Amino acid sequence: PGHSSAASDVYKRQEKGLGGLMQSRLQNKRASSKHLSMSLIEMSADFINAYILGSVGKSGQVAGACATFFYNLNAASTLIKSDEIDYAVIGSAEAPINPEVTDGFFATTGIADDKKIIAMQERHGESIEDIDFSKACRPFGDNCGLVLGESSQFAVVTSLEFAIKIGAEILCAVPHVFINSDGIKKSISSPGIGNYITMAQAFSNYIKDFDSKKQTCVIAHGTGTF
């Protein structure tokens, strides 16, 4: 048996989803029958599972803002380890760039606007005659705020035995998934105690076997924010 698990937090506010549904009366337009269904948070899993893959397996979602992918990875891993399913397609999808959502991010004062980008370029001794938007996001560096983007990510997760059985190309292993809430903190962009607990749990489980020369990929979240 298989399972699909994915979600989106912001995309449903787009024109084809909840955004279009809420705007239709104001714009003197007729609401589409698809507006309501496409506004559901789990549609990135349900639609693909049923109408693209044609699967009759389980489908669901767990949403957790920027950690949505990992919540769904954790759900799939738990089901596989309990022998309830053999494999799962998991992921997340977001397309938040529209006027209303952008206004919401600007209201947090955490987004990189023209004034902040110019100030950052000046701090780096760069020309301030023009804004270099290609360098607005600088991972692990001196940044000026969040840069909005749109993306989706999906992965097929199986047990080791099932992957070998079907001859799948194994790209990585998922021995553990650790997720903790931030806890109380001063701002949404600052790290919370939960972040430190998560990293401590993750590193403590494989640090004894850690070899920096063998690490080919490290993905960190929020590196281009502040």
Task: Cite the ranges covered by each PLM segment.
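Active-site-proximal alpha-helical scaffold in enzymes
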Residues: I41-A45, N49-I52, S59-E94, L146-A168
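Short acidic, glycine/serine/threonine-rich loops at helix termini
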Residues: E15-L18, L73, N98-G104, K185-I188
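Condensing-enzyme catalytic core mediating Claisen C-C bond formation in acyl metabolism
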Residues: I117-C217
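Beta-strand segments within the central parallel beta-sheet cores of soluble alpha/beta enzyme folds
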Residues: S5, S59-A63, I85-A93, E169-F178, ...
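Active-site-proximal gating segment of KS-fold condensing enzymes and close homologs
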Residues: D9-S59, T102, F106-S127
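Conserved small-residue
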Residues: S8, I48, F69, A76, ...
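Extended C-terminal subregions enriched in glycine
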Residues: G224-F226
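Single conserved hydrophobic/aromatic residue that forms the stacking wall/gate
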Residues: P1-A7, Y11
